[in-house]
Amino acid sequence: ENVSIGAALEYAVKILGVKDIIVMGHAHCGGVAALCKSINNDKEGEAKDNPTDLIKSWVDIAKPALSKIDFDHNDANIEVNSERAVVLYSYNNLLTYPWLKDAVSRNSLEIHAWWLDFKSVMLWKKAQGSDSFIPMDF
């Protein structure tokens, strides 16, 4: 657990009175692509030296998010599904902070999970009560 993340969240919500937290992901995310590549290399038994060990350590935090993604099938949506899975993973991780979960249940805080498709210029949000994403209306 990274204490600085919790401290920043605690300061924002408890001291500054932030009412909304947005977990934002986006299409063609290099971090998620690197994580997917790392998972495929692990499956194939390829151990590669990584000149970006700090970046790898950072993206590896989200590795559990991709446990339900089937990388063995060449699915056209695998990139989008992986990116959105990481957003949901981060969203759910926020709710592991008891004081954040409590603030959400008291309706004094809202946590949003969004995913942006740069190409279509569409913003998607986590559907309430579901792990699916729906387009946002403006």
What are these regions, as identified by a protein language model?
Residues 1-20, 31-138:
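Divalent-metal-activated hydrolytic enzyme cores
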